[in-house]
Every structure is written in C-alpha cells, then in structure tokens.
Amino acid sequence: MQVPYLQIVFLLTAVFGIGVKSDDCKTADLVVNVDGSDDVSDREFDKLKRAMLMLVRGLSIDDSQIRLGMVTYGSEIGDSIPLQGDRLDLARTIRYMKKPGGPCKPFKGIGETRKMFSSRGRFNVPHVTLNLGGDIVDSEVRDLMDETDKARDEDIKVMAIGLGTKVERDEIEGIAWDKEQAYFMDDADDLVRRVKEIPDYLCKIIKAKKPRKSASKKSKTKPAKKPDSDIVGKSPGFHSLQRTDDKPKMSKKVEVKELCDDAEWVEDVGYGSVPTRCEDFVMCQNVSGSLRKTLKTCPYGQFWSRARTSCVLTEDEDCSDDLCKTMLLPSRDYDVSCRAYWKCENGKSVARCCPSGMAYEPGKGCVLDSDCDEECPPKGDSDNGDDDDDDNDDDDNEYDDDDDEMEYNPNCPLRPIKGSPEKFKQHTGDDNWEEFDCAPGTLFSSRDCACSILGRPEKDDNGKNEDDTSKVCEPELYLPFCDDLHDYSGKETHVENEGDAVIIENGKAYFNGRAGLKIPRFSGVPYGKSVFIKMKYKEDEDDDKKRNDDDKKLRIKRDERGRKGYRKGGRKDDRNGKRRDDRIGKRRDDRIFDDRKGRRTDDRKGDRRDRIDDRNGRRTDDRKDNRRDDRKDNRRDDIKDNKRDDKKDNADEPMTLISNGECDNFELHDCFEKPSLAITTGKKFAGFSVSSTERDEVDLEVDNDKKGYLWNKDKKDKDDKNRRDKDKNGDRTDDKKSLDDLVKEIERRKSDDKKSFDDLVKEIERRKSDDKKSFDDLVKEIERRKSDDKISLDDLVKEIKRRKSDDKGNGRRKDDNKNDEDDDKKGWKTVSLKINNGHIRGRRDDREDKDIMDGDLKTTFSGFQIGQGASNKNFKGYMDEVYIYFCDPGKEADFDEEDDNGDDDDDDDDDDDKDNDAGDDNKDDNNNNGRKDDNNNDGRKDDNNKKDDKDRSDKNGGKDDKDKDTKDKFSDKDNGKDNEDADRDINDNDKLYRRAMKKCDFVNKNVEKWLDKR
C-alpha cells in the first residue's frame, strides 16, 4: 500500500518546554527524520516543515538542555542537520530543507539517526525516536522493524505517530517502544493543530523504564557481540564529540574485534577504519597469543586513510562518513580544543581555529570567551603511534606556531603574516603555504579576508613592520549612492539589489516599499564591543498627500450627508402618505380641515393626530424615525471612520531601515532568525531593538511627542529665548518675518518719535536670525552710523530697500545653492545607533535615548538588510547615506550636518561679504557727503537723492545684466507663459543633478582623506 500522507520520522533526543513540568523532561537530544520521498507532495512537505518550526519555537533548545537534529530521506539520505542547541539556526536551516525524492525507504532514515546518536549523542542523556508517518509499504516493513530493534537495543526509545485513516495499528504499535507510545492523527493538518501535545508524549516516553521487543515482527539480525575485556583506549566520539579530561564510562562499545577483521596488516600490526568517525582508527596487535586492540585519533585536521594506511589532511581524503557530505550548516564543533571546529569546504571537513580570546559555539561560530585559553592547533595532539607522522606534523605546523600568536578569520582560507601586514599566505596543497603581496596602498585584513585596509605599513625602531591601522576606526560600509551601490569605505563590500528594485539616481536610493538591499558579508561575523550605524533618509510623502486628499473628500461627503439628513429629519409624512414641511406648517396660522369628518381643527390637534394612527392604535412619532435615520447615518460614519483610522494606523506602522535578521511570512508571519539589531522609523518616532550575547534585549524609542529626551543645547537656548520674547510681547508670529515685513514695520513706526534708534537696533538684532546675511550687514551699518543723529528713518527705509535689491541681484549662485540646500534638507532625517561596551544610544536628529545591556551585540547568520526585515513594513522613501562601523568613530561621525565641502563654501561667502562691505563703505561715504550738502542746502537734498538712486539703479542694472546668464540657466520663471511648467521641470532636474554632483564629486575626491579624519 502507498502512503496517503507525509511520513516523517522524528528522532526526538530532547523534550520540549511546552507543557512540560518535570525537570526530567527538560534535557534530551532530538533528531527529526523527515520523509521527503515521492509519496509526499510539495504542499504536504511545507506543512511538515511548518510543524517542525512550531516545535522548534516551543522547545527549550539550548546546548545544556535540548539539542535538535534533523534528517530528510527518500530513496537516499537528503539534507541533514547535526545536533545543536541554537534555535534560530535550526529554524533557518529547516526552512531551506528540500525533498530528496525517490521511493520511500524509512529504514534508511532510522539508520542515519542511529549514526547521528553514535557520533554526536550526549552521554547519559535520554535518546528518543519519534516515527511519524502513514501506512508502510509491505516491502519496507521488515527493514524498518530491524532498524527500530537496533535502535531499541542501543537504548533509543521509539515513539510512533500514525498519520491517516489507512494506517495499520499493529505496524505503528510494533515500531513504538510499547503500545502506550503509539498515537494516531488524521493527517498533516491535524499534526499542525495538535503539535502542542507532542511534548507530553515525549515526557511520557522518557520516563518509561522497560523497553520491549517489537510486537509484530522480530528482527532477524544477530545480536551485537561483546568486545574483548582487554581493549585499550576508548573512542572519544562514539557517544560524544566533547572531549573532557575525566571521561565517563560508555554504556556501549564499538565492536573492535570486527574492525580488526577488516584491518590492513603491516608487520604484525593491523590498522582499521572506525565507522562514522573519519578521524579515528584502530590498531590491532598479537600480544602473547591474544589480540590487543587500541583506538587511536589522528592529529589535528587529519582523517584516517585506509588506502595509505596513515593519517592525511582532510582535503586529501574522501571519507564516506564525513558529515559535511550531508549537513547544511557550514561548520560544527571539534572536540580537541575550545577554539577548534570543523568547517565544510566543497563537501569536505577542514579544521579551523578561532582567534585567541574566542571560543567556538555550535551554530554561532566564534564568540568572545575570556575563559577559553587553550592552544589551537593543540600541541602534541597526535596519538597515532607513528613517529614518522609526528615528524611530519611538526613540519606541517611550521606556520601554525606563528599563527597561534596572531588572530585570523576561521572562515578565511588566507592567513596573515606576522610583521608583514602588506602580505598574506594561502594554502596551496601538499602542506605548502605560498606568500602573496597586497595591492599597493592596501594592507591585509583577517576579518575581511582580503587586502581591504587603506594605508601603508610603518616601521618601528627595530626595523620591523608594524600595523598601526588598528588604531584608526574606519567604516565597514559607506554607501553614498553615487556610483550605484559602490562601497566607498575601501572594503569593497558587495551589496545585493535583487531585481534592481531599489532605484539609484542623483545620489539617492529610492525604496518602493517592496524592495531592499542585502549585505551577505556580515553573516556570522562577530561585531565586537562597538557598533555604530548611521543613516540619512526621507520618507515618501506621496502617500501622505493622497491620504490627506482622501480624508478631505470623506469629510465633504459626510458633511453633505449630514445636511441631507437634516432636511430629511425636518419633513414628516401625513396620514395620506404625502410629505410636508413642518417648518412651513408651524409658520402658518390658518386652519386645517379633517378630510374624514369635514371639521376645522387646530394645528395642535392636527399635530396630535399626526402622532397617533387611529386605525392601528400605534404611535408614529416622526422623532423616532429621525432618530433611526440618524443612527443609520452614524453607523455609516463610524464604519468609514474606522476604515480611515485603520488606514492611518497602517500608515503609522513602523518601517524597517536596517536589520540583521531573516524575516518573512512563510505562513507563520514570524522571523526564522530573529534579528539582534533593528532600526525602524515612523512619522514621529524611531525605534531601536538590540539583543546581546547574554540574551539581554533592549528596546529604545525616540518619540517627538514625549518629553525627557535630550535636545541640542543651541536649539534649546533658542527656544527659550523665543519663549521669553513671546511672554514679554504677547502672542505673535513675527519671529520669521521677512525683510519686506521689517520694512513695513519701520514705515509704520517712523511717525512715532518715541521709538529711539537704539531700540530699533535691538529690534533688528532680535530678528536677524531670519536673514543672517542681510541683517548682519544692516546691523553693522546701523551701529557704524549710530553716532550720526542726522540720519532719518526715511534714509533707513531706502537703505533697506536698496540692500534688498542688492541681495536679489548679487550672488544668484549663492541664493540657488542656499535654496538647493534648504530643499535638500526638507523632510530628511538622520538616525544613528551606537553600541559601545554595553552602552546603547539611539538617536534621531536632535533627540536621543540611552540604555545599558549586558554582553555584546549578538551575531546572526543573515547579514545586514537595508530597508527590510524584522517583521515590519519595508521602507518606502529615499536614502542618502548609510554608514556601518564595528568600532567607535567618536563624536565627529555622529551628526556632521555640514561636510568638509561646506567649509569651502563658507570661505567663498566670507570673501563675498568682504567685497560687499567694501562696496558699501564707498557708497556710505557718498551718502555722508550728500548729507553734509543737505545741511547747507535743503533744495539740493532731493536732487542728490535722486542722483544717488539713479547711480544705484545703473550699477544694479549692470550687475543684473552680468548675472543674467546665470539666472537663465536655473531660473524657474520664463517670459513665455506656455513654457512655465516645462521650465520648472527642467529646473528641478537641474537642481537634483547639481546637488548630486556636488556630493558625489566631493566623495570621489576626498573620501580617503575624509575617512582618515574620522
């Protein structure tokens, strides 16, 4: 019979934390064996993976509690996950598991799980097998029973759950540990619904004491032979890969005698391989007529080669039991040192060491650990009993002795060379390491696994090269979006833009709300004690405008409906079904006839008859009808108001700016790898979420509506000053008045003789923040002329008007640049997250929030994602710059609103101001001469003023003609009315292009100097 539903074999070596109260059920090892044969459809396979993910989230997974593994099988073994205690890595790997296909052979899955228990199972920890599947094909029953009997003999408890209505109860009960450990469910959907019950099943089977043989069919395999009592040595990894000084006794031993039967004999010494342990071998010797067997382990980074009868480098031996052939994760632990681990490269295991001060943790990689001070590679690790191999091992470690004193990236095939940072070495095979030179001007970076550090090595007093670049905090990533997604940090970090969904143009990146950027380089990389991220962005305002228009239309419709309801409520029906206006009826003073009796009645009596139906005896008060109509209208209004509120709530949902977790829906609406870092943004807030290596989680929120956050001191002082002025002079809004408003104010006050010159100067000084250039010059001019009491308010008004025209005509380029900068800053926000030695600071613009956490930022294996992740909405808007540091760049990198190129512009402005001041001095001398003449002859005063005005107009006219070409290039106005829109579009594009070129030219020319300064 064929299997109607999916068949999974869960080898549960752990007990879940859901609903488990007993401490006896909290420690175990779990291997999940998944049926991926042709009997399983893709949809059913996804449901089974979903059930597995739900189990993973409910388990108390940890290296000290529950460890989980998984195997997929069809006709052969497919993807596998070794036993580990990292929940996020398990969920991430389960998601990418694929069906191997082929006929269903469940006994191969059981056999593979037995190997996993033998190689990675913990000693003295319950081992449980859960067989979950449908009806079993008759031809596979015997093999499956044989494997379950072997598992039972190895103290692996088997629990069986049958899926479907066609499963045979006897077969399921025969697989299980006993009949009480056999369960039945309708289908895969029923499994998803009842997945929370499985922890109780597991706890029950863990507490079961007496195993029994299969009830239906007994295995015909021969019982395992007991090993000889004189065996010397124990394999360090048949039940545990964790090597300790005090090794417990093993409950089961390898059949060494059988291994010696297959050994290769060389001069009365036999050498044999050990199943499932590529790095182990057995030595067999005849001693006094008896066979002495000794288990041995190859030196660090070597496997046993049966063909060569010796230990060789792992890359030179194709071991069929190498776990890298079946596992999905890139690395696993190596029990020779706390720093050692195996890395999978091209399907083979390669030994690696974590840098000093770090330890390897399964599923996490190299993590900071001050207690891990073991040597790696371990000295004297060889235990093969062969002197030649020992000699070769010394030669092999010629470079390793030097490398042990240096830190290097365990995931990098390149090694640094001590004292030569401009070089690196690479393993070329046959125990040879070849040196290579970095490109000129660069140094080798172990963390980047490339020559990515800008700089040159310096020599110390002894003549040795010393790498001082470690003292300079440089960004790991800098994206100004000038040359597409080119990284200007010098690290050449690759940034993925899938489908080119993120549009790069004019020095900005546009995110449409469905796109994002991915940076895989930071996957599995320890961030260290300091992390600094800074981003400049602007949300898309088109949605807000559309939303406001919709709200306006909704309010108009609701007002119209309210007016119609008012007219409807003011009209009533009479007994004949005709509608009349009560207001008209109330204004009339005439009499109304009753048609039935022909009598004249008063309006009040008619009103009473209108309220009572004599034929039916019921009240028909129109007020009730009106109330009913009002309730209907109110209900409609409430429904639309709720919809509008929902739209606003959706619009105010946080959008992800950057995260380092892998999150999407996948029918679970959750993250498969929870990010340890996420920055989100909303209309009025910015959110920061951080998780540490000590499982400490910190959430910060910078909200514009909340008090208690820090402000810039300058802005605070300015606000306090404006508030004092407002309290002193009353409620007014003239703080932002333009020059025209000031002229009108002076003209209005010029008749007031009580207004002194000093008061006017103070008034102008108070408002000079509105137009720094014009008002600064004006204040200087007034203070210089203040001693001359002969100047009148009329002259002052003319002077202001003249200055205003000069400002319009002079320096059109400066006005354009200023307008461009104002447009460029409009709506832009800057957000940063700084983590330094456990201190966290989240900041947006001039507000910030702080907190403290234990441990460093937790490393994830998803890399960084810009504009997406963390189970929030994708970012929709523009980004201008993105910085990522793994060090502390200092306060200079926090919020530098004006870049270095702004200094050059300021210098130019100062020169222009000096020229203007000089010109003003000459004009002032002329005016002073004119005023002296006015004292002698009042009649010539008007003529001189007219002449001065004419001269000024000529000068300004010539200046305007000179700047006419500049105005024509970027002017928004045109004499032709039909071409106004087209000119405006061209002008906008020119502004965007000029701003982009200004930024990108600066970045291209000064990025190296600029980064060194930081």
UniProtKB/Swiss-Prot annotation:
One of its GO terms (molecular function) is chitin binding. Residues 859-874 have a biased composition (Polar residues). Coiled coil: none annotated. Residues 212-224 have a biased composition (Basic residues). Disulfide bonds join C298-C311, C354-C366. Residues 1-22 form the signal peptide. Residues 212-250, 377-428, 539-659, 710-740, 802-875, 890-995 are annotated as: Disordered. The keyword Repeat applies. It comes from the Eukaryota. Nacreous layer of shell (at protein level). Expressed primarily in the mantle with highest level in the mantle pallium and lower level in the mantle edge. The keyword Disulfide bond applies. Residues 539-563, 571-651, 802-817, 843-857, 916-995 have a biased composition (Basic and acidic residues). Keywords: Chitin-binding, Disulfide bond, Repeat, Secreted, Signal. It is found in: Secreted. SUPFAM superfamilies: Invertebrate chitin-binding proteins, vWA-like. Residues 383-407, 894-915 have a biased composition (Acidic residues). Residues 29-202 form the VWFA domain. Residues 555-558 are annotated as: Kex2-like proteinase cleavage site. One of its GO terms (cellular component) is extracellular region. Residues 257-374 form the Chitin-binding type-2 domain. Essential component of the organic matrix for normal growth of the nacreous layer. The complex contributes to the initiation of aragonite crystallization as well as subsequent stacking of aragonite tablets in the nacreous layer. Heterooligomer; disulfide-linked. Pif97, Pif80, N16 and other proteins form a complex. Pif80 and Pif97 are rich in Asp. This amino-acid appears to be common to biomineral-forming organisms. This is Protein PIF. It comes from Margaritifera margaritifera (Freshwater pearl mussel).
